[in-house]
């Protein structure tokens, strides 16, 4: 009985440890996406100014 409980514990720990690296990949993708979004938001006013300058010129 003890061996069975130990085997179940071992299996559960292996399953819970397996998805961890995948979550790190998703976090990296999310961080890159956030940086791109922030860059677009910050570049928005500059693009608007360039558009107005072209319209005037």
Swiss-Prot record:
Q: Name one GO biological process term.
A: antibacterial humoral response
**Induction entry:** Induced as part of the humoral response to a bacterial invasion. Transcripts appear within the immunized fat body.
Looking up InterPro entries in the UniProt record yields:
Cecropin
Has UniProt tagged this entry with the keyword Secreted?
Answer: yes
Record-stated family: Belongs to the cecropin family.
Q: What does this protein do?
A: Cecropins have lytic and antibacterial activity against several Gram-positive and Gram-negative bacteria.
> What name goes with this protein?
Cecropin-A
Q: What is the source species? A: Spodoptera litura
């Amino acid at each position: 009985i003890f061996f069975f409980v130990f085997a179940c514990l071992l299996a559960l720990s292996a399953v819970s440890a397996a998805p961890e690296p995948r979550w790190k990949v998703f976090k990296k993708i999310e961080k890159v996406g956030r940086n791109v979004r922030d860059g677009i938001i910050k570049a928005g006013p500059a693009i608007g100014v360039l558009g107005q300058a072209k319209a005037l010129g």
